[in-house]
Amino acid sequence: MIKLVLLRHGESQWNLENRFTGWHDIDLTERGRKEAANAGKLIRAEGIVFDVAYTSVLKRAIRTLWSVLDEMDQMWLPVHKSWRLNERHYGALQGLNKTETSQKYGEEQVLVWRRSYDTPPPALGRDDERWPGADPRYRGMAEGEIPLSECLKDTVARFLPLWHETIAPQIRSGKSVAIVAHGNSLRALVKYLDNISEDDIVGLNIPTGIPLVYELDDDLKPLKSYYLGDQDAVKQAVAAVAGQAKA
């Protein structure tokens, strides 16, 4: 039996302000830093020791991973950063307040943009300052790989090569792996692992800063999955994510 630990970054400043964040590189709040440290304590208490960790190229995930490894006394651990673990790109919604956007376009439309599988938000133009094409961390990417907007289907498509070519082989070789990423890049992985339908994925919400443990068989099929920590607090955190875009 193999354990894989998934963790959404701690609360960011734009989580606190209820904004669509996407690829914008916003930092953690003080609460987010505490969530990250607490996640490390929960993982350590579970007796899990990592061999390798993966995260995005966005500081809210990177800093969360640092805090986790610090609490586990594993700051030396090999860490691999990839844009393929970035949050989905919210296009022209990036930076907008979710509640205000719901008031303007309607809760139903915003829910489709936030949680549907194959409907992306309105796209950015390449001349928009929010388009990440000029960011040096994406310098090695082809222009066509840098998104103007993404739905979850797009996020799955750009994440799965990293899973199949890099992460899954590490797990199969016996390595204990941590993936610290974002709500939608983790939804992409959970959809794949649990074979969740395109309709049912709409209802999946992942809270910030709470470790999600998968127990996998030798074929990397899930035997079970569970959040660490107080389960009532987990339910409240999941419900809070679900309610973010209510008008």
Curated annotation (Swiss-Prot):
HAMAP family listed in its UniProt record: PGAM_GpmA
BP terms from Gene Ontology: gluconeogenesis; glycolytic process
Family named by the database record: Belongs to the phosphoglycerate mutase family. BPG-dependent PGAM subfamily.
Reported function: Catalyzes the interconversion of 2-phosphoglycerate and 3-phosphoglycerate.
GO molecular function terms attached to this record: phosphoglycerate mutase activity
Disulfide topology: none
NCBIfam families: pgm_1, PRK14115.1
Binding site for substrate: 8-15, 21-22, 60, 87-90, 98, 114-115, 183-184
Pfam families xref list: His_Phos_1 (PF00300)
UniProt protein name: 2,3-bisphosphoglycerate-dependent phosphoglycerate mutase
Keywords annotated in UniProt: Gluconeogenesis, Glycolysis, Isomerase
SMART domains the record matches: PGAM
Designated gene of the protein: gpmA
The keyword ATP-binding is annotated on this UniProt entry: no
Known pathway: Carbohydrate degradation; glycolysis; pyruvate from D-glyceraldehyde 3-phosphate: step 3/5
Catalytic activity from the UniProt record: (2R)-2-phosphoglycerate = (2R)-3-phosphoglycerate
Active site (catalytic residues): 9 (tele-phosphohistidine intermediate), 87 (proton donor/acceptor)
Site, Transition state stabilizer: residue positions: 182
Organism per entry: Chlorobium luteolum (strain DSM 273 / BCRC 81028 / 2530)
Enzyme Commission number(s): 5.4.2.11
